[in-house]
Amino acid sequence: MKRRQALKISSIGAIGLTASISSGCSKNNYFFHHGVASGDPLNDRVILWTRVTPQQVGPLEAILEISENKNFSSIIFSKKLQTSSLSDYTIKYDFLAKQYCDSDMGFFYRFRAGNVISDTGQSKTFSENTTTAKIGIFSCSNFPAGYFNAYQAAAEKNNLDLWLHLGDYLYEYPMGGYATDKAEKLGRVPEPKHEMITLSDYRQRHAQYKEDQGSKALHKHAPLIAVWDDHEFSNDAWKRGAENHSEDGAEGDFYARRSAAIKAYYEWMPIREQKNKRRIFREFKIGKLIHLIMLDTRQYGRDKQIQPKEYLTKSGFNQAKFYNDLNSNNRELLGSEQLSWIEKSILSTNAVWTIFGQQVLMAKLKFPDISKMLRSEEIPSFLKPYLKFLGLGIPSNLDAWDGYPAERNRLYQLMINAKKRFISLAGDTHNSWVSKLEDQSGSKVGIELGAPSVTSPGITDILNLDEKKFVNSIVKINKELQWMDPSNRG
């Protein structure tokens, strides 16, 4: 932990040194290393983003250009925009597309700085008459774990109207940490090499991810709607802390760390900012077809996760106390403010489908006894503490909605009362899932599609399991689960 403190001090020193460099740039000393992006499309406007890299420190100006054709033979809109080190030289503009071009048809955009021109991006808004939409779903894109081939492939298909990222857009771990064992071989060592803690750390890691060729290809192809999960902050985050943040303060104040992560996220993502920066939950309407509600199940209202090991006694596992605490009506995942907002939101539209874009699995899920499925006699050290809980029939993923059953029931009741058909989209697990969602009485309330990771390893790889045995067993013992795939990324 002393190493992390030293790194924080060195980062502060580096910032001070950079700030002392004289300002002023020649017109040719600009670069667009991080591509362009668009996001948060409404029926009349969309966010357009880029990052200008100057060779010297100081405020600078860039020009946004919009055209209805790719060669920009006719520019229908242009605007001078300012940026500086205060926003890490990122630029965002909320373009009122409806005034200049037809909704659904799309447009092209680019930026100029000096004599340098950025990549050309393509974006669009969705009119009230939209009847079809092709949407890509992504989650868990871990740079050192592998190439972002899924992004590249989606861009090359050239048929997406929109893509969603359900969280873990980037990871906080240092070199030598989670899923970095192949990083040097792949040429994907995380930057900085230490764990993200300061604003400088988060900015540098975001910059590295945005420089990836697959990422740049997809970002410029179609608008993005994104929400954060935990790794944009720190593993297993909740509203007042995180598993990967030391309680003794060796990693600094958690709230300061979270604020730094949020600031960098808003700077580097094509997302529309709200007055309360922590409030990322928001809604989008794609014609009368889809009412898309992006939730925050991670840090806005979430209570701390229950840890089964805390219910171990000398006489065994205290199931009575475990279930009493787990099922408490006071446990929140969304929080009352967000839940009330959802209720008002779903009652305000008559879209054919209500879709929740959110972070963690909503379906009820129990794990089989995997001790006999291990392909190696050596049990991973991190797995050993959990083996004693297998076979007890308790929920297995308490970081997901299974850890907050009362809150899940409250959400289900809202949807039942509003007579809404809904789809839950989830990320987080790195695996693919299809489940039918049921309320406490066993009545169907919706379906869930769990998205695989872009690169983070799946459960059978992490635990070294026999894939066929695991899939057959987990589907068999879970009533809601219809299908799962732990091995394919995408």
Where are these regions (language model features)?
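Metal-dependent phosphoester/phosphodiester hydrolase catalytic core
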Residues: 3-9, 15-18, 26-490
